[in-house]
C-alpha cells in the first residue's frame, strides 16, 4: 500500500508542475498526450483506492492558478473542462453511459464541433456591450484580459439584435491561424526575437501580454462554443440553435458544426474532420461531442470537473516524447545542408517516427539541443516530423554537443553560410552528387545553354545510369549511349548530339547563368559578363570589385566568390572551357538620349501582355537602361505587369516609382 501512496503522490506532483508550466508560464515541457496519460494513470489509481482521493488532487479541478500580474476574476458559473476519449471503443462507452443515465435506447442527437487548440476565454456582455474578458484559470478564478481581447477584431465589442440578454457570458477559444503563426515566427527570426513552438503557445503568449499594444499586433481570432452566465434573457433549448443565436448577435462560430443522430453519424463526422484536419488552416486536436437538447444536458448534470453530457473525442497525438540518438546532415537538391535527428522510434499521429528535421543551425541553438536529449517530436498532417522542444529536466549527464560540418558530407566541398541567412549550403554546385540532377537541368535549360530536346526525364536517366556526373560530361556523350535511354531512338539521339554541339557556341552571360551560382539570375549574369568581359577577370575579382557591378550586393558577391573559388567547381569549369566558347561581350554603346529610361536601373516584374520580357529588356537596354533582376535601394523604376508579387511589394516598401506596362510602352515611344 505504501508504494501505491508513493506512486499517487509522485503523479500528483508531476501533474501540478506541468499544469503550472502549461497554464501559468505558457511553457509546456511535455506533449498533451503525455499529460493525458499521467492524468489517466492517476484517475485509475484513485478509482481503485477511493480512500486516497484528496480535494487538492489534480483530478478534482480543471487547471492551474492565474498569474498575479493580472487582476483576478471569479467566474460566476465555473468554467469546467471536458473528459476525453481516444478511440471509437471509448466513445461508444461514453454514448452508452449517456443512454443508461437517461434510461433510453433511442438514438440521441449530438452537436459535434471542432476541438480548437487555443486558449479558453469567457466574454461577459452587459446590455450588449463587452465589459469583461477572462481566461479560464483554474475554472473558478481566471485572469482579467479585457484590454487584450478588445484588440481581437473577430470579437464584437457590442452585440446586435433585439433579443440580447441583459447579461450573457459567452465562452469560446482564442487561437492563431497557421498562416499568421508562420508569419509571426518568420518575423521573430528576422529580428532575433522569441520563436513559438506551436500556434497554441503563440496564442496563449499573445493573449496574456501585459501590454495590449503587443497583443494588437498578433494575428489572433476567436470562435465561440457555449454560454455560462445568462441573466435577463432567454436562449433556445438546443445547443446548435444557441450557436446560431450567437452568430446572429455577431459572434464568430465555426462553420464545421453538425448535428449527428446516433453513434454511427458521430463517428463518421469524427473521421471526416480527421481527414480534413490538415487543410483547415488552424490547429485542432479532436472533436467535441455534446448532447444537443439542453433539457437533457440538465438531466445528465456534471461530475467533479466535467459535464456528463459532453466529451472530447481526441485525435491520435501529434506530439510525443522520445530520445535523440544521433544527428546527421543531409544535402538537398539546391545544396541546403539540413540537420536531421535520428530518434528512438516512437508512434506519432499513427505513424512510427524515427527521424525528424532540425531545419538549421539557428534552430539547434534555439532549442538548446544536444545528442542524447529527451525531446518532443511533432508530426502534423503530411508535415515532415520535427523536434519542437527539449525536456531539460530529463537531460542525462552524457549528452554531446552537435557540431555543424564545415565540409559537405556528400562531396567534401566547402560549406558557406552568408551572414543574415539561416541556411548553410554546399558550394560544390557543379560537382556535388546531391545537387547533380538540378544543376544539370538548369545548365541545359532554355535561358541557359538551351540544349533543345534535353528534358528533365533524360537528365534523370543520364544521372541514374551514371553516364553524367557534371555539366562537362554532357559534351562527352555519344549517340550510342543515348540510344540506351527509354524512348530514345537513333534519330532522337543524333538530334540531341547535334543540339549539344550547337550549345557549345553561346554567350558569356548565358554561360554564367548556366553555372547556377546562387542568386545569379539572367540580369545579374548579363551585368557580370558586361562588366568583366572574360572569365579570368571575373575569377580575379574581390568582393569590393564584384559589388561595383549593378545588381550585385554583398550577399551575391559572396555567393559568386565562394562558387568560383571552390576547387571542385574550378575543375568542372576548366573542362567546360575546353568545349564551350563565346564571343567577347560587346560593350553596349548608348547614344545620348533624352529617354526617361537612360541611366536608370529598371526591374521588370509580373506578366507582360504587349511585349515579351526579352523584347522589353532589349528595348530598355537600347535606351540606356540597366535591367536588373532584383529590387534594391539602387533601383530607380519598377515596371509591374499582371500578377506582380514580392518585387512590387518591396518597391512599394522602399518608395520606388512603379509604372504599368501601358505606361512603359508610352515612354518607349517618346
UniProtKB/Swiss-Prot annotation:
Location of the BRCT domain: 592-670
Residues involved in NAD(+) binding: 32-36, 81-82, 113, 136, 173, 290, 314
Residues forming coiled coils: none
UniProt-listed CDD domains: BRCT_DNA_ligase_like, LIGANc
Alphabetically ordered keywords of this record: DNA damage, DNA repair, DNA replication, Ligase, Magnesium, Manganese, Metal-binding, NAD, Zinc
Family the UniProt entry places it in: Belongs to the NAD-dependent DNA ligase family. LigA subfamily.
Job description of the protein: DNA ligase that catalyzes the formation of phosphodiester linkages between 5'-phosphoryl and 3'-hydroxyl groups in double-stranded DNA using NAD as a coenzyme and as the energy source for the reaction. It is essential for DNA replication and repair of damaged DNA.
HAMAP family: DNA_ligase_A
Protein name per the record: DNA ligase
Species of the source: Yersinia pestis
Gene, per the UniProt record: ligA
